[in-house]
Amino acid sequence: MKRITWLSSADAPDWFPDPESALDEPPGLLAAGGDLTPQRLLAAYRRGIFPWYSPGQPVLWWSPDPREVLFPAEFRRSRSLDKAMRNRGVTVTFDCDFAAVVDACAAPRDAAGGTWITPEMRAAYVALHALELAHSVEARRDGELIGGLYGVALGGIFFGESMFARARDASKIALAVLVENCAARDIHLIDCQLASAHL
């Protein structure tokens, strides 16, 4: 029977168990504990591992298989998205307001008011952004932030963390512009981590 590994503060920040040892149920759960230092986060991403947990839980580390990925070279916009990008008056920028994008992604989206982006998680990704390793894409209309996403770029891969939309198709437009700019940024794969009907 597989069991998750507990990471302690005594463990080297770049040590993780083999992703092959991740649980089947819940799918991909690999380890618990540790911290969200840049060193540990980067070590995790290099092995296809990411943190995802709720307030009150220890840091939970995941490596699901299969996982959702996009190949920018194979990306084709749908007609409806192409029309939305032409007609909605949306301007897309990169790394212009990282903290605002994370805060918008962290805003509760359901009646229960839950979010997985804890203050510690926010601080960790802001620290990665300061190191120019975490990046945001902002979609604005008339200067107002209406959608966007953020993630980590490492080794030719963009690891998408979260996205939000305050207007129809705004996050999809941000994602499409990211994908279309991947070649210029030396990104060959986008790891969406978990399958989503939104993509």
Roles of regions detected by a PLM:
Residues M1-H198:
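N-acyltransferase acceptor-side catalytic subdomain
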